[in-house]
Each structure stands twice: as structure tokens, then as C-alpha cells.
């Protein structure tokens, strides 16, 4: 289902206008080149001949395109309303019906030929669109897989990076233990005068407790 298109009542006007603009631009370019080529010799006459050809023949071409677009969109809306779905078959049947309707004044044989041509052209367009969509979908899947592989490779660090990170972590832990040791020693130095004043009169051996050495603190921190 095509979600980027307008609903059916508005779709007819939209397709008619788009076809009219296509006929106007394409017809103007083609008729200008044709008029410039068929004009008499001289640049001014060539320019005037091209403009005159555009003025005379482009409106008819644009009108034919607009009628084709409106007829195609109308048949497409009828098919959507009847089948209650939007797929490639609607466009193919609409192309055949449009070709037959527009060639109705030329007889049954002309209608059949025009319907066959319209059906063939729309089938080729729908097939090309489906092929392009499939190619883009496959490319998107491959790119998604490549991006996932790249992310996985980025998440897996090399062995030397892991060893460097572990050594950095060990060094940081050792530095933290040394800082705690320095802070503990400074705290003991600050508490020593206060203890001596509080326990004045007692024996010096009972007052002063042995201080922990750096090796003992490292063992208490479970580094070794």
C-alpha cells in the first residue's frame, strides 16, 4: 500500500495536475526544439519559430496528458474501491483501461491495441519499481549487518589494551593505599599529644601503642 499518496477523491485531481505539468514542460521543450529546427535560416527566425510552435501545440499536449492522468487515476480509484486493496494489479488494469477508453473513437481494434500497450507499459513500470525496492531493501539489510559487525568489533578490545587497563587499575589501587597510609600516619601524629594529656600519670608503656608499619597496612588492605 502506498502511504505517500493522497486519498482517492483528491488523488484524481493530484494526478491530473501532475500529468498536466509533465505535458507542459516536456511538450514545451520538444516543440521548441522542433520549431527551432524547422524554422527558416537565421537565429531570430529560429527563436521565433520555436516560440510559435510552443504556443500552438503545447496546450494540446498538456491537455492530453491531463486527460490521461485523470482517466488513469479514476480507474485506479474504482479498482481500489472494488478490490479493497492497493497493489500492482490496480495500476496494470488501470493502464489497460485508460488506453482502451482514450482510443474508443478509433474502433475496437485500436482500443485493443492501445489497451495492450497501456497494460504492457504499466506492467514494466511496476516491475521496475518492485526490482528497485528489492535492491534497496537488500542493500539496507547488508548495511545493517555491516554496522552490527563494526559495533561488535569496536566493543571487543585487544588484549594489550586489557593488560594496560589492568596495570593502570593496579597502580591506582596502590596509590590509594599509600594515600590511606599517609593519612593514617598523620592522624596518629595529631592524636599523640591529646593522648599524652588525657592519660597523664600512667605508664608510658601502656599509653603508647605500637604504630602500624606500611607493610602491615598493605597486608590489611589485601593488596598482597
Curated annotation (Swiss-Prot):
Q: What is its main location?
A: mitochondrion
- What's a GO cellular component annotated to this UniProt protein? TIM23 mitochondrial import inner membrane translocase complex
Extent of the signal sequence: none
Span-the-membrane segments of this chain are 16-36, 60-80, 115-135
The membrane-topology field of this record reads: Multi-pass membrane protein
| Function field | Essential component of the TIM23 complex, a complex that mediates the translocation of transit peptide-containing proteins across the mitochondrial inner membrane.
Q: Please report which protein family the annotation says this sequence is part of.
A: Belongs to the Tim17/Tim22/Tim23 family.
Give the protein name, as stated in the record. Answer: Probable mitochondrial import inner membrane translocase subunit Tim17 4
The lineage is: Eukaryota, Metazoa, Ecdysozoa, Arthropoda, Hexapoda
Q: Which gene encodes it?
A: Tim17a2
Amino acid at each position: 500500500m502506498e502511504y505517500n499518496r493522497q486519498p482517492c477523491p483528491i488523488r484524481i485531481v493530484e494526478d491530473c495536475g501532475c500529468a498536466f505539468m509533465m505535458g507542459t514542460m516536456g511538450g514545451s521543450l520538444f516543440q521548441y526544439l522542433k520549431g527551432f529546427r524547422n524554422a527558416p535560416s537565421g537565429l531570430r527566425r529560429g527563436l521565433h519559430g520555436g516560440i510559435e510552435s510552443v504556443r500552438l501545440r503545447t496546450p494540446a499536449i498538456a491537455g492530453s496528458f491531463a486527460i490521461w492522468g485523470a482517466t488513469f487515476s479514476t480507474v485506479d480509484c474504482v479498482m481500489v474501491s472494488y478490490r479493497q486493496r492497493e497493489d500492482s494489479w490496480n495500476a496494470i488494469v488501470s493502464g489497460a483501461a485508460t488506453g482502451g477508453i482514450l482510443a474508443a473513437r478509433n474502433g475496437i481494434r485500436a482500443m485493443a491495441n492501445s489497451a495492450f500497450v497501456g497494460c504492457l507499459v504499466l506492467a514494466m513500470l511496476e516491475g521496475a519499481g518492485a526490482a528497485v525496492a528489492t535492491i534497496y531493501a537488500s542493500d539496507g539489510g547488508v548495511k545493517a549487518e555491516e554496522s552490527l559487525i563494526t559495533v561488535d568489533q569496536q566493543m571487543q578490545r585487544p588484549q594489550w589494551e586489557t593488560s594496560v587497563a589492568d596495570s593502570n587499575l593496579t597502580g591506582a589501587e596502590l596509590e590509594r593505599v599509600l594515600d590511606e597510609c599517609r593519612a593514617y600516619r598523620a592522624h596518629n601524629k595529631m592524636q599523640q599529644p591529646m593522648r599524652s594529656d588525657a592519660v597523664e600519670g600512667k605508664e608510658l608503656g601502656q599509653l603508647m601503642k605500637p604504630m602500624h608499619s606500611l607493610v602491615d597496612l598493605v597486608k590489611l588492605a589485601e593488596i598482597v
